[in-house]
Curated annotation (Swiss-Prot):
<keyword id="KW-0732">Signal</keyword>
<feature type="binding site">
    <location>
        <position position="168"/>
    </location>
    <ligand>
        <name>Zn(2+)</name>
    </ligand>
</feature>
<keyword id="KW-0864">Zinc transport</keyword>
<keyword id="KW-0406">Ion transport</keyword>
<dbReference type="Pfam" id="PF01297">
    <property type="entry name" value="ZnuA"/>
</dbReference>
<dbReference type="InterPro" id="IPR006127">
    <property type="entry name" value="ZnuA-like"/>
</dbReference>
<comment type="similarity">
    <text>Belongs to the bacterial solute-binding protein 9 family.</text>
</comment>
<keyword id="KW-0843">Virulence</keyword>
<keyword id="KW-1015">Disulfide bond</keyword>
<feature type="signal peptide">
    <location>
        <begin position="1"/>
        <end position="23"/>
    </location>
</feature>
<feature type="binding site">
    <location>
        <position position="232"/>
    </location>
    <ligand>
        <name>Zn(2+)</name>
    </ligand>
</feature>
<protein>
    <recommendedName>
        <fullName>High-affinity zinc uptake system protein ZnuA</fullName>
    </recommendedName>
</protein>
<dbReference type="GO" id="GO:0006829">
    <property type="term" value="P:zinc ion transport"/>
</dbReference>
<dbReference type="InterPro" id="IPR035520">
    <property type="entry name" value="ZnuA"/>
</dbReference>
<feature type="disulfide bond">
    <location>
        <begin position="277"/>
        <end position="331"/>
    </location>
</feature>
<keyword id="KW-0862">Zinc</keyword>
<keyword id="KW-0813">Transport</keyword>
């Protein structure tokens, strides 16, 4: 069985170098993470369903590619992802297994609101890399055999660099509207027969997101100026859209544990600002958050930038935005 598994991985890996001539005609749509998959799903309603790579409570920061993921990338006609600075695990596989596919980095979509990384003071300076060595990441994935596709993904992981812009752009629902239109255009070019349907779906989804933006803005109005601390600095697009303001983040990268000095700095920040809530994330161990709030009056809450516990599909993205608003509203004092 193990030999068959190895044979499959070797075949998939080699197929990437040989191109689509060996893989056959490409078909299907692959999307990296749940929020983007949700938007693509909405645009594709009535036509088809895209394949999701990072499923469940997985995080793009520490994900290892599975054989089924490698196969999907190998045969995909269109691949959507945020971009190489976000899903570093996909960079190498897309270059090899995805050769011949239409690859779209949605972080490059025209018209997006784009925000630079926050650095200094309460926001730990970015090293413009995901941080951590290859060995540390391997430990984060857990013990056990590493498949070849995962090794391809990790080969360039520690060498990849952030750009100057924060790539959590989907947390602004108005960016979600722009993404839907961009996705519809790409799909229409690859599948002209259904171009009108994609465009219609994107327009309807955009109107839904306009209504959502108004709804969330009204809900958050009572807590707009209340300081809070986040696990890692992923939410400034949401904050910028709705007038919220995080007072700081515990760590710059979820896979990189902060030192004692950093924890003490945030602890002092909570006390000096009177921050009433510190938010963890469902994808990561909340122990750090508990350590930070120990000895303060701050409560803990959960913010989920990916929709870890939400059902995949077109409704995930609007619900993700609502859940962020609800978590903030429930934890912060009115």
């Amino acid at each position: 069985m193990k030999n068959l598994h190895s044979l499959f991985l070797a075949s998939a890996f080699l197929a990437g170098f040989c191109g689509s001539s060996l893989a056959g005609e490409r078909e299907g749509v692959v999307v990296s993470i749940k929020p983007l998959h949700s938007i693509v799903s909405a645009v594709m309603q009535g036509v088809g369903k895209p394949k999701l790579i990072v499923q469940g409570a997985g995080s793009e920061h520490v994900y290892s590619l599975k054989p089924s993921d490698a196969e999907a990338i190998e045969h995909a006609k269109v691949i959507f992802w945020a971009g190489p600075s976000m899903e570093t695990f996909l960079d190498k596989p897309i270059d090899t297994l995805g050769e011949g596919a239409k690859v779209v980095a949605l972080g490059d979509a025209k018209g997006l609101t784009k925000l630079k990384f926050r650095e200094g003071g309460p926001f730990e300076a970015h090293d413009h890399g995901h941080g951590g060595s290859h060995e540390e990441e391997h430990d984060a994935h857990g013990s056990g055999d590493h498949d070849h596709a995962a090794e391809v993904a990790e080969e360039g992981h520690e060498h990849h660099h952030h750009g100057e812009y924060d790539l959590h752009f989907w947390l602004d629902p108005q960016n979600g509207k722009i993404l839907a239109a961009d996705i519809a255009k790409t799909l229409g070019e690859s599948d002209p027969e259904h171009a009108a349907q994609y465009e219609k779906n994107a327009k309807a989804y955009g109107e839904k997101l306009d209504a959502l933006t108004r709804e969330v803005a009204a809900e958050l109005k009572p807590v707009k100026d209340k300081p809070f601390i986040v696990f890692h600095d992923a939410y400034q697009y949401f904050e910028n859209r709705f007038g919220m303001k995080a007072a700081g983040s515990i760590t710059v990268s979820p896979e990189k544990a902060p030192g004692a000095a950093r924890i003490q700095q945030i602890h002092d920040k909570i006390k000096s600002l009177g921050a009433t809530c510190v938010f963890s994330e469902p994808q990561f161990e909340p122990k750090l958050v508990k350590t930070v709030v120990d000895g303060t009056k701050a409560r803990t809450g959960v913010l989920d930038p990916l929709g870890a516990e939400l059902k995949d599909g077109p409704d995930l993205y609007p619900q993700l935005i609502r859940n962020l608003a609800n978590s903030l509203k429930d934890c912060l004092p009115k």
